[in-house]
């Protein structure tokens, strides 16, 4: 049951919680991510996706988890993305 | 990408590439759809189609009738198409093409009703098209240029093949300045002398360090966000570069002459520099008020404000649920359009029709021109384009930035109420949200009662044994 609360990312930048996060943070807003931990240099964009949409910053983790947890494995999958460039 | 010769550029330093031409792109855009990724970013196809189809015969500069140099023999097929275009009624051709259908066009907050092609002789219909095209071609068009002074220490005297995001952002900010100084209903006059405000705006976007918002100065200001001559850049970094440049200019001008170079507050709607939550951006009314207050040097009155909202709306491609919301932003009277386009190809998207974006394309190469700040007789034709280009909204890259200009407090309030309505239509996934004030981050630990949260009865309290862990350890990168 512990695993269901892991968070996992894809798209090159992966994030995971060490279990318990959704319980502990269920009344918290989305966690503040530090760019250096995602190997993003300062000054780059950071966007977090749940179910391929941007979660509302004021949403509580508990409700995000309940809405979007994976039905199969109980994980809440978060994806992190920076931005594309144009020329 | 291969670097192509600067096709479509005449030796004239003010080549009116698109002047007076309309929408032969109805076919070119289709072509581009198929092969744009393989094509050079200099939009050779669009140049090919820049032969002078004069819709506004009476309004033409004589220069618009020059033959373009781009119709080389290798593009004979284009002449066939051109003949097709020329032989039929232009309106009928447009009406059956995908560039302009009979549906309503929303263009920078203004709606144009275009009738169907059957009524091509109908004066109302034509005026619908004509008034739209007059509006479209009055927007400031900023493109790749070559032949300018080298950018700082680099050897770059041209931004061909790398400057499109910078150019797109210049177009958006130029529109903000046009709206501010001249109003949304301003149209480019048919005759000189021009408005001093209009010339003054064009001067600011000239290609030299002496011009406030030149590519030279933007790259320098955006250095810490990865902007550099020759490098591609994303919309978020571009917005931050503008923020830095405007701040720097403001400080310098206060020291030098006390004048404002940028006549409005600038709000880049995004999180902090280092730590961000990364969700949908939040327009905070208190932050906007503070920025206006700072702009007014401490007086607590409102000021005009430019909002830039950088976004990423999907991982690999744009999530289609955002498209109706993006379209709706063009109905806001505050709309300044969008920086973005197909992957790798930034444009200035200024309008929408059906499921297609209408844009101004920076991927044309023109010679740099110097428009003196007070030269109201200047040739400004290279800063306008009558060629309406389009692309399917679902093909745009998820990385983009939306702009809004709010003239005063009432206008800002109107923007906020429209944005809030749009949140309600978003079915849980808005582009951005509006709040009154910044809430301190909620980091409450649920030591006792996770079941108190409605709907979370499935969370197992027994696993709550790690309360000693710090927040940092809770969020590891896989």
Swiss-Prot record, chain A:
Subcellular location: Cytoplasmic vesicle, Autophagosome membrane; Vacuole membrane; Cytoplasm, Cytoskeleton
Membrane topology: Lipid-anchor
Residues anchoring lipid (Phosphatidylethanolamine amidated glycine): 87
Amino acid composition bias (Basic and acidic residues), ranges on this chain: 1-14
Region ranges (Disordered): 1-30
Modifications the protein undergoes after translation, according to the UniProt entry: The C-terminal Gly is amidated with phosphatidylethanolamine by an activating system similar to that for ubiquitin.
Main localization, broad class: membrane
GO CC list: autophagosome membrane; cytoplasmic vesicle; microtubule
Keywords of the record: Autophagy, Cytoplasm, Cytoplasmic vesicle, Cytoskeleton, Lipoprotein, Membrane, Microtubule, Protein transport, Transport, Ubl conjugation pathway, Vacuole
Gene Ontology BP annotations: autophagosome assembly; autophagosome maturation; cellular response to nitrogen starvation; mitophagy; protein transport
GO terms of molecular function: phosphatidylethanolamine binding
Description of how the protein assembles with itself and partners: Interacts with ATG4.
Family: Belongs to the ATG8 family.
Function (record text): Ubiquitin-like modifier involved in autophagosomes formation. May mediate the delivery of the autophagosomes to the vacuole via the microtubule cytoskeleton.
Full protein name: Putative autophagy-related protein 8E
UniProtKB/Swiss-Prot annotation, chain B:
Gene Ontology molecular function terms on file: cysteine-type endopeptidase activity; protein-phosphatidylethanolamide deconjugating activity
Amino acid composition bias (Polar residues), ranges on this chain: 1-15
Gene, per the UniProt record: ATG4B
Keywords linked to the UniProt accession: Autophagy, Cytoplasm, Hydrolase, Protease, Protein transport, Thiol protease, Transport, Ubl conjugation pathway
Keyword Hydrolase included in the entry's annotation: yes
Reaction it catalyzes: [protein]-C-terminal L-amino acid-glycyl-phosphatidylethanolamide + H2O = [protein]-C-terminal L-amino acid-glycine + a 1,2-diacyl-sn-glycero-3-phosphoethanolamine
GO cellular component terms, semicolon-separated: cytoplasm
Name of the protein in question: Cysteine protease ATG4B
Function: Cysteine protease that plays a key role in autophagy by mediating both proteolytic activation and delipidation of ATG8 family proteins. The protease activity is required for proteolytic activation of ATG8 family proteins: cleaves the C-terminal amino acid of ATG8 proteins to reveal a C-terminal glycine. Exposure of the glycine at the C-terminus is essential for ATG8 proteins conjugation to phosphatidylethanolamine (PE) and insertion to membranes, which is necessary for autophagy. In addition to the protease activity, also mediates delipidation of PE-conjugated ATG8 proteins.
Domain of life from the UniProt record: Eukaryota
